[in-house]
Amino acid sequence: MEVTAPKLVGRHLRVAFMNTDATGSSPKFERMTNFTAMTNGKNPKEYSRQYVDESTERSDVVGYAPATEYSFDMYAGNPVHERIAAIHDGEKVADDAHVEVVTVDFYKKNTKGDKCFATKRTYAVIPDSDGDGTDALVYSGSLKAVSDIEEGYVTETDITSKTVTYTKGDYMGGVASTDFKVEKTQERIGE
């Protein structure tokens, strides 16, 4: 049996796409280009305690506060940049500062090679600064989660894709895990 050696995954194989549709009719997930930083932090919430009959403290993760720190060079005519800049410059609040982002792992393809694993989440754009430096107009801030993460896939498997179409479900071709639980529950009820 042939053993395949592990391969290092390049950062460029995890690509983010933002919904730039302003009409609300049909999502248009466009590639988030020209970002100089896009670092995801999970920010786990811990519950730590020490019981009187034990010598060691215990810790559990009880929640998360995911945030993605970003920085980009502003390009006029880039719909993603214009959407984020409008939130910064207009000091938008509440739902007006929310964006949907699909993150695609182009290195995670199904066995047929026609789908890539993706996640979707709604974030609040939290502006930090703009105008830093003299070479380009730079915007920076963070995207903080306002929804649960949803797993799905995209059928665009080319790393150079400028847009993607996201579908909720299992990229390996099976039933989505939440749908599976519902089916199993219904199966038991019907027995």
Functional labels for PLM-detected ranges:
Residues V154-E191:
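Intrinsically disordered, low-complexity terminal/linker regions enriched in Pro/Ser/Gly
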Residues I87-V93, T122-V125, L143-K144, S161-T165:
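Short, low-complexity, polar/charged sequence segments that are solvent-exposed and flexible
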Residues T36-N40, V104-E151:
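Short beta-strand and beta-hairpin "edge-sheet" elements
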Residues L8, A22, T39, H88, ...:
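Intrinsically disordered, low-complexity segments enriched in small/polar residues
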Residues M1-S71, Y75, T122-D135:
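Solvent-exposed edge beta-strands and adjacent loop segments
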Residues A5, F106-Y107, D179:
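Generic N-terminal leader/processing signal
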Residues E54-K120, D148-E156:
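Extracellular/virion structural assembly segments
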Residues L13, P27, P44, P66, ...:
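Polar low-complexity intrinsically disordered regions enriched in Ser/Thr and small residues
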